[in-house]
């Protein structure tokens, strides 16, 4: 196994990971919508003033202020939508969103999506085919951030990972 120290809400805890845990070895198949180029969108990154944060609630009802570098604006089916972005890896963006499939065909609390860093001209590719479920789908011990109210899309994103069905037993 592996131990690591995590901090949540100003409190420290130990996280234990074990490669042969039943939650990993008993993992059922993942389901995805068929890849669709119509969900690979060219978006516009709209930066916020430096230092801006956004309140993000996690699945345990803990709230934290997270760096919010800007929002992405995209069009789909003739409508314009915006998602507030968090800082991602390597200068990229981390998007937490819910949509009209949430709780039906996809995980009820929302999904995640990582992007590369916005280009110099302010464009960024938002490929919903790469949307994935948060870790709390697979374990009761994860403290997953939830979509802020601004990131609840009035749109059915029929792309990316679908709702996970835990194996019986």
Regions found by a protein language model. Name each.
Residues 6-11, 64-68, 87-91, 117-122:
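Short, ordered beta-strand-loop transition motifs
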Residues 23-25, 50-51, 83-84, 104-106, ...:
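Short helix/loop capping segments that flank catalytic or ligand/cofactor-binding pockets
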Residues 15-22, 97-101, 129-131:
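Secondary-structure transition/turn motif
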